[in-house]
Amino acid sequence: MKVKAPILLLFVFLINFCFSIKQTQQQNFDITIDNNNYNNNNNNNKNEIINNNNKNNNNLNDEYFEKLGYDTNGTKCDICKFGINQVQKMIASKQGIEDISKYAIDLCTYLHIEKAEVCNGLIPLFANMTYNVLSYPTVTGEYVCGFVGFCPYVPRNSSNIINFPKPKPPHVPPVAPSPNSPTMKILHISDIHVDPVYESGMNADCGEPLCCRAPNGPGVGEKAAGEWGHYLCDINMKMVESMFEFIDQEFGEDIDIVFWTGDNPPHDIWEQTYDSQINASQLVTNLVKKYFGSTAKVFPAIGNHESLPVNSFPLPPGSSWIFNALSYDWSDWVNVDEQVANLQYGGYYTLPVQSGLRVISLNMNWCNNGNLYLAENSTDPANMLQWIVDTLQASEDIGEKVYLVGHIPPGIPDCIDSWSEQLLQIVNRYEDTILASFYGHTHRDEFSVYYTQSDENDPSSPMRASNVIYTTPSVTTYQHQNPSFRIFTVDSNTGYLMESSTYHTDLSQANLNGKPTWLLEYNTTNTYNIPNLTPISMDLAIQNINSSNSMLEDYHVHYYSASPYPESKPCTSISCKLDYICKMKSAAYLKYYECIHHEVNNYLLNESDDDSIKSHKKLNILLDLNNYLNNEVLKSC
């Protein structure tokens, strides 16, 4: 049995990469930090957090690991390094992929990570990637485990300094457009995840990553898939078509631009094939063409679920099969030779909207820490960061404004820290060129703000808002989400954002009434009492939410698109508030840790206790936050 130790690695990957999509197993959010030595200028904050993970968070079978010869008092970091080292020993002894896959399937089944059929389908999909990456001579257990988030991560290029071709010109604050200005409308849809074999009446709680299918058998009561969908499953084609029909009827030719930011396939990640992935893209492409192909300019972006297996994007030219397929599907819109070449090379491109305004579509899988291929090069995979700089510089030189669109927001744990920090530098350098950024991936409705020094020559100067990320809620209901889309109203002349309007349908009511009713859920300016969507106004929105419990609860409800979940879990705790406020203030993920400590210190500022008692209170707040993040915040991927 000792030979089975190596597949511990694959077990770790199953947990961390969200392969099993189990809500309690995504990301490490442990916040037990040394209160006295907090330095927010580097990775030390996050690494202290990771180092304090303990075995209570591992959810592993201790008896099994003791049989493997592993000390179960170790941290998740220790477990990960142990597994990596064992696999690398197995590779060095010339044992093959088939051996590792067999052992991984045995472990996956033995520990009930997934049902046997899921283990048998899922693990072989990842075996080649795992074997190949761990065969790199420079890849160590410590490095890989840091990369995936279980250990302190030290990127090979630790400076992360971007060299810009020209110095930054003096900042010119944006002038909000007049309310009477002519406008355009941008439709943003993301994370459709349509399941073409969804079947009403089937079991929605089947114990697999995706249910509501005929092989799952019939469900009973609330666990039966509804006619229009179920909160535990991906969306069905019937509901997707209803959404597109509503948009067409309500807005018609008023939609000028469509941002479509990826993730078309369902979450049946253990059953997927090259053909199924391509077919999923074609299915959604045909819908977008049907409703907007002749009336709007469409700008797609690639998601992490487009590849096979999920999250897996080898460095160029290793991902050419999916990039070429998408290039074919998107040929009505991405049809300039130079940009077709960029798309086929790295999954990114840029195109003009009109004179003075362009879109840069990013492949955010080059920052995805679920993409193990980036262990080989996480500094600037596919040269996309340098390409972004070159493209933005060209736009700045001619006074052109830019929208950034992509799938994975850079301020969440799924984006590699060092890469995220580099993008932060780029956005702040070109803040007067970039109008806003638009992402999806989390399935939730959220926004975050970039900040920079008010005087960039003075590191002690106060911070000011420089740009904004808008994360649009998903079309899919997976998980606990009402189907949603967003309409931005923008100034026709300048492209400046004026309003953000989010629409959804109540899935429970759709199933009850026999048809969905699509409604405006909220307008951002009215809900958060701000005049417009400039970075300064969105920073004001954060201040308003921070000072108003009712506004915070509104944000909480909108975060889940007014699904039943927030009604059962109101945002009344310090932890809930801390999490939301710091997400809003963290367009780069390491800023989240900085924000947490800043907010907690402010909270304790007026306490009359001595320092030791304050330190104890702070630790308790951080422990409560850690528990909240691991047990109450729903994750999607």
UniProtKB/Swiss-Prot annotation:
It comes from Dictyostelium discoideum (Social amoeba). Its main location: secreted. Keywords: Disulfide bond, Glycoprotein, Glycosidase, Hydrolase, Metal-binding, Secreted, Signal, Zinc. SUPFAM superfamilies: Metallo-dependent phosphatases, Saposin. This is Sphingomyelin phosphodiesterase B. GO terms for molecular function: hydrolase activity, acting on glycosyl bonds; metal ion binding; phosphoric diester hydrolase activity; sphingomyelin phosphodiesterase activity. GO terms for cellular component: extracellular space; membrane. Residues 1-20 form the signal peptide. It is found in: Secreted. Its EC number is 3.1.4.-. Zn(2+) 1 binds at D191, H193, D263, H443. It holds the Pfam family Metallophos. Binds 2 Zn(2+) per subunit. Residues 73-155 form the Saposin B-type domain. Glycans are attached at N73, N128, N157, N279, N377, N523, N546, N606. The gene is sgmB.
